[in-house]
Amino acid sequence: MKNIFLHSLIVENYRNFKNLELKTDNIPITIIGENGSGKTNILEAISLFYPGRGLRSARLADICRESEDHCSVRALLQSKLGLAEFSTQIKRISNRRTTEYNNSKIANNELSKFTSMVWLTPQMEGIFTSGTSDRRKFFDRIVYNFDPKHAELVSKYEHYMQERNKILAEDMWDNNWLKTIEEKMADTSIYIANNRLKTLEFMQQAIDDLENEFPKAELSIDGMVEQKILNGEEDVVGFIAAELHKTRDKDKLLGRTSFGVHKSDFLVKHKHKNILAKFCSTGEQKAILIAIILAEMNYAIKLTKTAPILLLDEVFVHLDDRRRNYLTEFFISINLQLWVTATDLKGIEEFGNKSQLIKL
């Protein structure tokens, strides 16, 4: 089994840090500090070496230290392809971010070829009651760990969709070009939908197989394209292209694309109670989310033979003793690089004693 882990992390002008350098190994790491000391900022910096905008989904301008026009994060990382140097540079004025692998520029969506990460933050605990987009992006990040090409597919689809919206905004359409773009969207949609359905099956099996102190979840995708594939319907590509053609006038008025895999929703039920997670208590929602994260991590290791970096922000807060003790024992037993933040070691003394301690 390959372990993805950081050997070192260097941040400059990042959030509240002018300069910070950390040396680490393939072991659990506990970051202790008061609220506002920068614990989550460190996790966010690490998460930038995975497709997307990091665990906060923050605007680039908000990441740079106040009064600084640029910031950077560098890492020496044991990747899927061996030891490598990664860096990301952010410029506030141009609102641009560049990423490098061994001093060569790469696209953000290519990072899943090299790294694998799973994270859980307090902000994610509201995912079941937030918008469809948040849940879909959460699930697509899970798919990245099972299929590294998925990030590139999602990025391509979004590019084609933006092109379509631009064409529709014009007074005169180039029908041939519009038809080509819609066909590309349809083709890419099938790959995205199939990847989601395949991962959904993997994840459900992982949840059902994993015995722990957290509630079982029942997962599903609510999307027209995914449903047609599940039903075994023929020529789904043709159906998507026809729907996009049919909604042109409507989408021109809306200024956006109203149909497609970018509208699918990721639904989660409390299996035992047979109710959607959004109707559960906040405590149950957090427990269900932890169960999903544990299943994702376990099955990613089983399927890809690669152990991801695990980033857990204040994961022990508001857990009862039974679940906190289970997580403590579980995290001590697994062989991967795990980053945990806490204001102090109260209740997790055993975990703190067996991890590298970073005090801010």
Swiss-Prot record:
* Subcellular locations according to the entry: Cytoplasm
PROSITE patterns xrefs: RECF_2 (PS00618)
According to its UniProt entry, the protein's GO biological process terms are: DNA replication; DNA synthesis involved in DNA repair; double-strand break repair; SOS response
GO cellular component assignments:
cytoplasm
A single GO molecular function term of this UniProt record: ATP binding
Record-linked Pfam families: SMC_N
> So where does ATP get bound?
G33, E34, N35, G36, S37, G38, K39, T40
**Keywords of this protein's UniProt record, alphabetized?**
ATP-binding, Cytoplasm, DNA damage, DNA repair, DNA replication, DNA-binding, Nucleotide-binding, SOS response
Does the keyword section mention DNA repair?
yes
**Where along the sequence do coiled-coil regions lie?**
none
UniProt xrefs under NCBIfam families? recf
Role this protein plays: The RecF protein is involved in DNA metabolism; it is required for DNA replication and normal SOS inducibility. RecF binds preferentially to single-stranded, linear DNA. It also seems to bind ATP.
Give the similarity note.
Belongs to the RecF family.
The protein, known as: DNA replication and repair protein RecF
Source taxonomy: Bacteria, Pseudomonadati, Pseudomonadota, Alphaproteobacteria, Rickettsiales
